[in-house]
Amino acid sequence: MKYAKTKEVLNQLVADLSQMSMIIHQTHWYMRGPNFLKLHPLMDEFMEEIDSQLDVISERLIALDGNPYSTLKEMADNTKIKDWPGTWDKTTPERLAHLVDGYRYLEDLYQHGIEV
């Protein structure tokens, strides 16, 4: 199969970018505290950027004759980014740290994609 490793990494990105988008949404919805007014609109920017990347990656995968994941089940079954339940037991700083971890993972995955 042509570009098999590239397609694999791109599809992993599809699953993980989808998961990251949901984590950003969750952070956006469950945010509270003194930095709310600054951070809440920033989450909108993060969501837009992740959604844009997801679209570009999916279209690139299609251009390579690949099949991007396109169901919630496929995303959930294939993501490597851990999710949290939607509850109020996490603080905003904890949620932001979770975002940072997700972005670091994505950075490594993009680098891996460049190398294959």
Residue spans for each PLM region:
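Helix-loop segments that flank and shape redox-cofactor active sites
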Residues: 1-5, 20-45, 109-116
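Disorder-to-helix initiation segments
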Residues: 1-13, 92
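Heptad-repeat coiled-coil alpha-helices
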Residues: 26, 30-33, 63, 70, ...
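Intrinsically disordered regulatory regions flanking bHLH/HLH domains
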Residues: 3-4, 64-67, 73, 82-86
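Generic structural signal for well-ordered, non-transmembrane alpha-helical segments
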Residues: 11, 15-18, 44, 48-55, ...
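Conserved alpha-helical segments that form or flank metal/cofactor-binding pockets of metalloenzymes
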Residues: 37-74
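Acidic/histidine-rich alpha-helical segments that form the ligand environment
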Residues: 59, 79-116
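Short, charge-patterned binding micro-sites
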Residues: 34-38, 76-83
